[in-house]
């Protein structure tokens, strides 16, 4: 969102100098997913908890959400997923990552440069994804190159079968703990073996 505030400010500066502010747009498809703005004031036992919490969220973020609504029509190449639709990494995985892009008769692999620490989740789909800071994201939006270090690829063989009462979450947490102890950071992981086959 901060990047779009900066672009709006750039439009104002260009207009002040007599230029055409409508020419300031991201040159690559840009998606703004509004998440993590919901404060839970009503508990899960209240059947209307979601609606009540969303109403509070809308009231507290009225100016912010108004600006975000404006960006949907003011800028080209901007797609907005409003609040109340889920969290960024879930939306990226389920709705926003086509894996293969197709434009002007050319097909090419999708990439994702995002400011959320969970951006790399889309790597699971074969989308090359990196998390960056806000300024680097703005550079990408304006057509500047982003350096992507190709990470090491590490195979993780899962053996055995999942036992009754053990959830996929239990396995993920145990794997995360193990990989941290082994100092596996910044690598692509490929899971294979009979244990991986039994997960799906």
Specify the residue positions occupied by each region the protein language model found:
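Fe-S-dependent hydro-lyases/dehydratases of central metabolism
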Residues: 1-200
């Amino acid at each position: 969102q901060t990047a779009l505030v900066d672009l709006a400010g750039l439009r104002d500066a260009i207009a002040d100098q007599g230029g055409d502010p409508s020419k300031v747009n991201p040159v690559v498809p840009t998606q703004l997913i509004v998440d993590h703005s919901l404060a839970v004031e009503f508990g899960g036992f209240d059947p209307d908890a979601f609606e009540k919490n969303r109403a509070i969220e809308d009231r507290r973020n009225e100016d912010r959400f108004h600006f975000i609504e404006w960006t949907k029509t003011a800028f080209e190449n901007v797609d907005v997923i409003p609040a109340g639709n889920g969290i960024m990494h879930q939306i990226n995985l389920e709705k926003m990552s086509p894996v293969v892009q197709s434009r002007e008769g050319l097909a090419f692999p999708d990439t994702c440069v995002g400011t959320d620490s969970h951006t790399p989740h889309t790597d699971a789909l074969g989308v090359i994804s990196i998390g960056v800071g806000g300024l680097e994201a703005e550079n990408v939006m304006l057509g500047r190159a982003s350096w992507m270090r190709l990470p090491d690829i590490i195979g993780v063989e899962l053996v055995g079968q999942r036992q009754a009462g053990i959830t996929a979450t239990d396995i993920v947490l145990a794997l995360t703990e193990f990989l941290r102890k082994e100092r596996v950071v910044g690598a692509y992981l490929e899971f294979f073996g009979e244990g991986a086959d039994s997960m799906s």
